[in-house]
Amino acid sequence: QAAEDRGMPVILDLHNFARYSFDGGKTYTLIGESSNLTAEHLADVWRKLAREFKDYNNIWGYDIMNEPYSMHPSAPWVNIAQVVINAIREVDTETPIIVCGDSFSSARFWVEYSDNLRTLVDPSDNLIFQAHLYFDKDYSGQYLNSYDADGVTANTGVERAKYFVEWLKRYNKRGLLGEYGVPDDDPRWLETLENLLIYLRDNGVPGTYWSAGPRWGDYKLAVQPSNNYTVDRPQMSV
């Protein structure tokens, strides 16, 4: 409600990687791995969330699950996503549904792991597909090495994003680059970021940066301003 009062759009995001812990985080169960955690359990959560939030005017979309990966063979992500879509549409036929790709939603490997998502059916024809993209060598966003050590160039982001963006064009789908971010320790990262953002703009794909908020402290990807909100982080110059 506070966001709506300020005209701020909100994405409701279930940030569980298609897993759930029944023991306080010691172990995690995959959705579909057992009868204790099925696609219908996830669908029921979203049915209830949609019923609760559907009348707000600032819900940009329901992001049904962040970065699913290594799913159980008997319960592929595409099947789970379809069950959730069906459940949401029972109570909300208007709000966009955001579907993250498989394998950590990788933009670079979208075709290899997430091509089957194009078979999803939304009765309201209002799906948005979400990919994530980082510039380090292992695509993880941990940025354990330097710009040079990881062999990054000014076009690394564009080259990786093309796999996702071209897929969107090929199948006439809408997309969102829901995570991207760079360290604050080398200005060359900023050039790579800027080129990516120009490419996304030119292709009509919105994006959201990872990450912000006071809880991140000195995390090198964060864009939270310092000195009582008076000093911006370097990434904000892009």
Which stretches of residues belong to each language-model region?
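Short, intrinsically disordered, charge-balanced linker/junction segments flanking boundaries
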Residues: Q235-S237
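Hydrophobic beta-strand scaffold residues
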Residues: V10-L12, G175, G207
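Short, solvent-exposed turn/loop segments enriched in Gly/Ser/Thr/Pro and often Arg
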Residues: H15-R19, G101-S103, W210-G217
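Substrate-binding cleft of extracellular glycoside hydrolase catalytic domains
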Residues: Q1-F53
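Short secondary-structure boundary/hinge segments and terminal tails
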Residues: S21-F22, D186, G217-D218
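Extracellular glycoside hydrolase catalytic/binding regions
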Residues: S34, E40-G61, M65-V205, L221-R233
